[in-house]
Amino acid sequence: MNGRADFREPNAEVPRPIPHIGPDYIPTEEERRVFAECNDESFWFRSVPLAATSMLITQGLISKGILSSHPKYGSIPKLIFACIMGYFAGKLSYVKTCQEKFKKLENSPLGEALRSGQARRSSPPGHYYQKSKYDSNVSGQSSFVTSPAADNIEMLPHYEPIPFSSSMNESAPTGITDHIVQGPDPNLEESPKRKNITYEELRNKNRESYEVSLTQKTDPSVRPMHERVPKKEVKVNKYGDTWDE
């Protein structure tokens, strides 16, 4: 294999180019015959009935007073206008039928142009269908055709992009922080020990200390030694000196 594959289907139809129909186009004999036929049929089968119907409706509206007549010419201007509108409406309504007549002509450039234009307008469904078949053929054939470059690409490791933060440092990833891992806080370890003393224990402790201080005040035997030892009487001379007897 040369690395290239022909994805064109063997039974695929090659679209023919649309013939250019310009102002200098000379119609064929068949096309002239169809033109004359369309002109006659559109006149007798569409224009005349619509023109006559429009004139009758207009005359009826004038006679009922819905439409006013001309003071000098009466209803003639409105009837002529209704006839002209019916004539052109009949011609326009026959255009689609005349196009179908040209499409049925085999060796007609004008008919081929009309058929190609209709195929172009209705091409999206077929276009997507052919495109899906083309994609399936590409995927089916590319599975058998491999190149060294494709093998090297498959052997390369796949890396996932790391998201970067939009903070002060743009080059730092969002998952990385600058803080240092610290050890356990000693205050956190001591806090549970302090919380072991309950309110009841503290209350009992305060009550015991209060009772001890109260007994020391009331019981003379518990008083300190310097309070129980009586003071010695000393004599003082006129100069303020003391002596024992």
Swiss-Prot record:
Primary location group: other
InterPro entries named among the record's database cross-references: OCAD1/2, OCIA_dom
Keywords assigned: Endosome, Phosphoprotein
OCIA domain residues: 1-112
GO biological process: regulation of stem cell differentiation
Coiled-coil ranges (or none): none
Note: 'Asrij' stands for 'blood' in Sanskrit as this protein is strongly expressed in blood vessels.
Record protein name field: OCIA domain-containing protein 1
Lineage: Eukaryota, Metazoa, Chordata, Craniata, Vertebrata
Originating gene: OCIAD1
